[in-house]
Amino acid sequence: MVSVSEIRKPQRAEGPATILAIGTANPANCVEQSTYPDFYFKITNSEHKTVLKEKFQRMCDKSMIKRRYMYLTEEILKENPSLCEYMAPSLDARQDMVVVEVPRLGKEAAVKAIKEWGQPKSKITHLIFCTTSGVDMPGADYQLTKLLGLRPYVKRYMMYQQGCFAGGTVLRLAKDLAENNKGARVLVVCSEVTAVTFRGPSDTHLDSLVGQALFGDGAAALIVGSDPVPEIEKPIFEMVWTAQTIAPDSEGAIDGHLREQGLTFHLLKDVPGIVSKNIDKALVEAFKPLGISDYNSIFWIAHPGGPAILDQVEQKLGLKPEKMRATREVLSEYGNMSSACVLFILDQMRKKSTQDGLNTTGEGLEWGVLFGFGPGLTIETVVLHSVAI
């Protein structure tokens, strides 16, 4: 008689979960941040709100964002005026857009990742799809399976309404799947479209304006698996350890509510303070077993919720300015793309490390950390091990 342990052992991979490929995609419509307040107040018929517009201009100027990419063009917004009002019932119009655009943008990123991976898509065993943009059944995971022509028995996991921390969540789940299913190859896709959150300005809901100044559209895809096939699969980063925690005394810090008016966000002013207060504990838990206490000796991939969060984390930990370089570059070029952001930063870091002639994918360093922050206030932590270039 065979024991349970004898059955389980050959089902598990030998090595750690490894990121084997990364692909990214954005809508064609590029929006320059410097002129966005003029466009935003004009398209929402709010040009008479001059004081509010000046406030929004200051938000955009301080955002450290140069440009963003958005599915919503001037033409689409003119055809859907309910999206341009502050709280007009508009969920049907928003849903009609995102249930098509979210999987379409996800496919664009996935095709790039699969091409870099170099293996046939028939070898994909699992699919994780994550979006905060719209809900449907069957979900975006099903739609992507059809769009890519994946096998019908691919094991799918659909994550809706997680928010900005979810780039860490999908990595945590992919790690568990890859390491506990020998030979598994997991396609991970995060796709975010701001059509679900766009709305006109209001004097009484300034935290909504913060979102209008920060959020952009984008999709990122990864292939994750353990025990890479030599000379065919090329490791980029290894995932060594993961954790998720709810920051104490943070209830209501970041909330999102899906209503007839779309997805509305509420933020407390102290979100940067809450993140910076709790990040040290997360780092100790993650890196004490490795004997690492100098956080300037590791590479950093942090969700760029906004410049204030990055500034306070740098100050709290005494980080050198270059530690957040990849994060700030992605924020500058794309804005806050919610769950997709940290995956864009992974891509940016490995490419820049190669361009700069460094000897590892992690800016020449061996160990690194990936952080996701979002509703809850929830913090995701992933310890990464770089790969020699």
Swiss-Prot record:
Broadest EC class assigned to this enzyme: transferase
Output the CDD domains linked to this UniProt entry: CHS_like (cd00831)
Pathway per the UniProt entry? Secondary metabolite biosynthesis; flavonoid biosynthesis
GO MF annotation terms: naringenin-chalcone synthase activity
What's its job? The primary product of this enzyme is 4,2',4',6'-tetrahydroxychalcone (also termed naringenin-chalcone or chalcone) which can under specific conditions spontaneously isomerize into naringenin.
* Reaction(s) catalysed by this chain's protein: (E)-4-coumaroyl-CoA + 3 malonyl-CoA + 3 H(+) = 2',4,4',6'-tetrahydroxychalcone + 3 CO2 + 4 CoA
Q: Which family does it belong to?
A: Belongs to the thiolase-like superfamily. Chalcone/stilbene synthases family.
Q: Report keywords, A-Z.
A: Acyltransferase, Flavonoid biosynthesis, Transferase
List the protein's name. Chalcone synthase 1
Q: What is its EC number?
A: 2.3.1.74
What S-S linkages are listed for this chain? none
Which residues does the entry assign to the active site, renumbered to this chain?
Answer: C164
In Gene Ontology terms, what is a biological process of this protein? polyketide biosynthetic process
Q: Which organism is it from?
A: Pisum sativum (Garden pea)
